[in-house]
Amino acid sequence: MPKMNYFFLRCLGILMLLIWTATLALAQVSLKTKQYLLLSGPENTASHQFAEDLAEIWSMPGVSFGSDLQPVSVVDGATRLKQMRDQRGHLAIINGQEAWQLLPDHPQVKVVSVLWPNVLYLISRLQPPQIVPLTAARTVRAPLQALEVVRAWDEQSPVSLLQETNWFRQEETIQALEGFKEDVFLSWGSYPLQEIRALLNFPGYYLTEAQDTLQKVWTQQLPWTRSYTLPAETYAGQPALQLLAEFPVLVVHETVPDSLVNNLLRSLFGHAESSNPRFLFRNLSPQHNLLFQQKLPYHPVARRFYRFP
């Protein structure tokens, strides 16, 4: 009987030791897990969806290396950058105009990558050929986010387009598309979009590109934009089109470790090049960063990743 008690106590001791070791290991893992706040737009925005997708990709085995990305919705880019300045955010997605205009005032924030292209859709009710001449449109329907686009166009137009524009909020795009009667409908968006495809099925609506002169005016006056080729057959029967594009920008606070920035870049483009990337990752390309290498304050790790001079 004493031998059995000794054997039982020895087994119990070994079991307790194993439990204590496992608990200690879990505690060490927990202590090593660092949470990074990724600031994006409100729900139902593309930047919010991208942040959610990136956080899920980051949580996959072998990606995060002991860290978590936590998406946080913040109303606009200016507020996101302010929170990063106050160390209440580690990463953020802001739009191209915000990056161009606001980053010089936030030297502690650096660019990791430009993201997917948001093209400027021009849906015309004017007759083909499918190019919107500089002076053709008399009435426009556009989101408030396209104010600078319409203002630059207005300066070249014989009519006051600013006064003849019916404005809507970007999140109201689907409702604004329904039965619009203006000459031209403008909207920023990724591609392909189901609502654009549905509209183009109706006769009398054409996906168009702007006249070269107007495109040049836009790229000169809106330096955060670039001309972008929408591939042929993105929408049925559509030829390749030269559209205006704006790229959202992923930025990071300088206190974030270089190793995380490096893993982030590899995760972004690794998923983009996978066999089944998520929607907003499909049009990511490292090459897009070449368009902005002299214009935006890139993180040193990103500059090496893109092989900037």
Model-predicted segments: where are they?
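Bacterial N-terminal signal peptides that target proteins for export
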Residues: 2-12
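Boundary at the C-terminal end of the N-terminal hydrophobic targeting segment
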Residues: 25-27
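Pocket-lining segment of extracytoplasmic ligand-binding domains
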Residues: 96-99, 155-249, 255
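Bilobed "Venus flytrap"/periplasmic-binding protein-like clamshell domains
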Residues: 32-61, 118-179, 292, 296-301, ...
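An extracytoplasmic/periplasmic, membrane-proximal ligand-sensing/linker region
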Residues: 172, 184-185, 189-200, 207, ...
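Bacterial N-terminal signal peptides
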Residues: 11-23
